[in-house]
Amino acid sequence: MKIAIFGGSFDPPHKGHIAIVKRALEELDIDYVIIVPTYLNPFKTSFQASPSLRLRWLRKIFLPYNRVKICDYEVRKGRPTYAIETVEFLRRKYAPKKLYYIIGSDNLPTLHKWHKYQKLSHLVQFVVATRKGYKVPKKYKMIEVHEDISSTELRIHPKKRYLPPIVAEEIIRFYRS
């Protein structure tokens, strides 16, 4: 089995995340994309939408995708979880022949600061989803995504056109309340 892990806060999930998943399924030789929402990103101090709410939104959004799995491992941990922990868990669970880890290009400047980065880089092949304003070095496999959407911006100004229709109204109500 070959899998790609796509971790993130998804606070909120948006059409850019869907575009990344679709491109990964099209361009990578994989059986599944496993989406792993964080409980709390180790580089952040808080979240707005609760982990269980973000998990529920992701399950609704990706229900029609038979090659996408939503993994609640980090949410169940109830604490910030390092990528290396999740990778080791998923390696034990699936024993993949190939393991990709999808990140946004905005993560590249701090990737070397990830917990046990050297070990992690030997266990996975990083795949970088492009984002406006960030260059991707040639050493990385790249997924071109032409969505200029920011979860940070959507928390402040939720806009329906950037949100998955199945959860758009719910997300807008949540962030406007």
From Swiss-Prot:
What reaction does this enzyme carry out catalytically? Answer: nicotinate beta-D-ribonucleotide + ATP + H(+) = deamido-NAD(+) + diphosphate
The keyword Nucleotide-binding is annotated on this UniProt entry: yes
The family this protein is said to belong to = Belongs to the NadD family.
Stated name of the protein: Probable nicotinate-nucleotide adenylyltransferase
Q: Which HAMAP family match?
A: NaMN_adenylyltr
What Pfam family is a match, any one? CTP_transf_like
Gene this chain is encoded by: nadD
| Taxonomic lineage | Bacteria, Pseudomonadati, Campylobacterota, Epsilonproteobacteria, Nautiliales
Gene Ontology biological process terms, A to Z? NAD biosynthetic process
